[in-house]
From Swiss-Prot:
UniProt name for this protein: Calcium uniporter protein, mitochondrial
Annotated GO CC locations: uniplex complex
Mitochondrial matrix side: 23-214, 261-333
Regulation (activators, inhibitors): Inhibited by ruthenium red or its derivative Ru360; possibly by obstructing the pore.
Domain comment quoted from the record: Forms a well-packed pentamer with an overall cylindrical shape. The inner core of the pentamer is formed with the second transmembrane region and the second coiled-coil region (residues 293-316): while the transmembrane regions pack into a five-helix bundle having a largely polar pore across the membrane, the coiled-coil outside the membrane forms a pentamer with a hydrophobic core, which may contribute to stabilizing the transmembrane pore structure. The transmembrane pore is wrapped by the first transmembrane region through contacts between the first and the second transmembrane regions.
Organism (species): Caenorhabditis elegans
Key words of the record: Calcium, Calcium channel, Calcium transport, Coiled coil, Ion channel, Ion transport, Membrane, Metal-binding, Mitochondrion, Mitochondrion inner membrane, Transit peptide, Transmembrane, Transmembrane helix, Transport
Entry's family note: Belongs to the MCU (TC 1.A.77) family.
Chain ranges on the Mitochondrial intermembrane side, renumbered to this chain: 235-243
Membrane-topology descriptor: Multi-pass membrane protein
InterPro entries: MCU_C, MCU_fam
Length: 333
């Protein structure tokens, strides 16, 4: 019996050691699972301070406390064009001390950077993470509806419908008022242009007469020269004496025409020479009679433009065009 008792005692001791080992192992597993659970749920933390979005001038504004300077900074968000990624980029640019910035939903799920601000505002609330700090952001109920893209599209369609109705109802009235205005401007311009036309016509008549006299004087000089050479050749002297004289006279004429080219940069032709004499005489007489050539040219251009606009306004192809298109055509002219 003593030997049997000695054999049972080591067996009981070994069983107790095994139970103690299992207990320690279970405690380590529970501690590890608790640590893992706490680390896996670390992104969902208590927020440092709540933030709220407000709306000013139709745009949402968010005041975010920057971690580096510990001061609030206002950020303007554009619902239709900005995204969460652009908001995060704006935060990084404003504070270089921000290493990590993200936006989470209320359930702890991170939102993609491609999510639009319009969609984010429709959530009503979300969480903003700056480094290790979390901020609960709330959106007022009145701020989520005006930035619905569907409502904006409906508003654009309504605006286009109103514009088309306005164009259809007011295009005739616009054309009549525009035509009346153009006729009044044309009448005023023609009234100012009429006395200048009379003065110009009088100066032109005087210049035409002067140019004709100059041309006939040149023809008479050539005739006198021809008669003088004929008299000297057949009556006074012989051809042997007059041949060198006529040669030098002809060569002198060539030199004179070349000098005319150097002075006017034009070849010597009778029509161009006559036009030059006429133009010089016209400007000389206009200055003498106080005729404003620049004013006359400006009025002539204005009258031509007004007549072209009236012609375009009365064109059958432009009868059913909208007012905005007609205004653009007139602005181009």
């Amino acid at each position: 019996m003593r030997n049997g008792r000695c054999l049972v005692t080591p067996f009981v001791t070994a069983q107790r050691l095994a139970n103690l080992r299992n207990t320690l192992w279970n405690r380590q597993q529970i501690a590890f699972s608790t640590t893992t659970a706490s680390s896996s749920t670390s992104p969902i933390q208590e927020s440092s301070s709540p933030l709220s979005i407000r709306f000013e001038y139709g745009l949402p504004l968010l005041d975010v406390p920057l971690p580096s300077r510990n001061e609030p900074c206002q950020f303007t968000m554009r619902p239709l064009s900005d995204t969460i990624g652009s908001l995060c980029e704006f935060l990084r640019q404003e504070d270089r001390g921000i290493d990590y910035v993200a936006v989470y939903g209320t359930n702890g799920v991170k939102l993609a950077t491609c999510t639009s601000i319009e969609h984010l505002l429709q959530f009503g609330s979300f969480r903003l993470r700056l480094n290790d700090k979390f901020f609960d952001v709330t959106v007022p109920k009145t701020g989520t509806m005006p930035y619905d893209s569907d409502k904006l599209r409906q508003l654009d369609d309504l605006r286009a419908t109103v514009a088309s109705l306005h164009a259809a109802l007011c295009v005739d009235e616009y054309k009549l008022s525009r035509e009346k205005k153009l006729l009044l401007q044309l009448e005023n311009a023609e009234t100012l242009l009429a006395p200048l036309h009379d003065a110009k016509r009088k100066i032109e008549q005087e210049c035409e007469a002067h140019t004709d006299r100059v041309m006939w004087a040149g023809f008479a000089a050539m005739g006198v020269q021809t008669g003088l050479f004929a008299r000297l050749t057949w009556w006074e002297y012989s051809w042997d004496i007059m041949e060198p004289v006529t040669y030098f006279a002809t060569y002198s004429t060539v030199c004179a025409t070349f000098g005319y080219y150097l002075y006017t940069q034009q070849s010597f032709e009778y029509p161009s020479a006559r036009e030059r004499v006429y133009t010089k005489q016209f400007y000389r007489r206009a200055q003498k009679q106080n005729f404003d050539i620049e004013k006359y040219n400006r009025l002539v251009t204005e009258v031509d433009e007004l007549r072209n606009q009236l012609k375009r306004m009365r064109d059958p192809l432009f009868q059913h065009l909208p007012v905005s298109y007609l205004s653009n055509l007139e602005a181009e002219k």
